[in-house]
Amino acid sequence: MNTLSFVHLTDLHLVAPGQSLYGLDPAERLRAAVHSICRRHGPDAAAPAAFAVITGDLAHLGEVAAYESLADIIKGLPFPCHLLLGNHDEREAFLSVFGGVPTTPEGHVQQALSTPAGLFVMLDTNEAGTHAGKLGEERLARLSATLEYSTDPVFLFLHHPPVASGIVGMDRIPLLDADALWQTLKPHRQRI
């Protein structure tokens, strides 16, 4: 298997400019992270990254202004950034800013990215009306077809953990169809 460096971030919880969250400015913290990432993983670094994946809770309240701030900040990355939705995200507001991201025909933000190291599968677990996650039959069917089509190693990304994390707050909002996900993955478990 080929090696590949990438950056993974999650739970940015950005708010509209000028607002704070628990006394902190999430955008300021993300700018500092991007600066560090560019220094450590930019094209001239010892370990340059091919891309970044941010696995959800991009915005705390799902505000358009927070997504606009995110778009502005990640422009500073010297490589592509793949975004997923989390339980705090609002699909319509997100897509109003990031309309060019890969989506399914049903509007779910997910994709399969072929890399020299394998297939990076990014799943949308955002479910309207709940903080819990769900894939549903359509997304699971797409995942199954993707896994059947490819024989490459698979790297799976999603916001909601498919197992109990031991963190009470997270375990209260589980991936509701985790068992169905495990059944979908089972025939391919040696590659994941």
Language model regions located:
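Extended active-site neighborhood of metal-dependent phosphoesterases/phosphodiesterases
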Residues: 64-149, 175-191
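A short acidic, helix-capping loop that chelates divalent metal ions and anchors anionic groups
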Residues: 15-20, 92-94, 129-132, 164-168
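Divalent metal-coordination and catalytic microenvironments
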Residues: 11, 52, 57, 70, ...
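Active-site-proximal beta-strand elements of phosphoester/diester hydrolases
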Residues: 3-16, 117-127, 155-159
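Short coil/turn segments at beta-strand junctions that form active-site/ligand-binding loops
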Residues: 3, 48-50, 79, 152-153, ...
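Flexible, glycine- and charge-enriched loops at secondary-structure boundaries
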Residues: 20-30, 60, 132-140, 171-175
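Active-site-proximal segments of metal-dependent phosphoesterases and phosphodiesterases across multiple
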Residues: 18, 152-192
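N-terminal active-site segment of His-dependent metallophosphoesterases
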Residues: 1-69, 73, 165
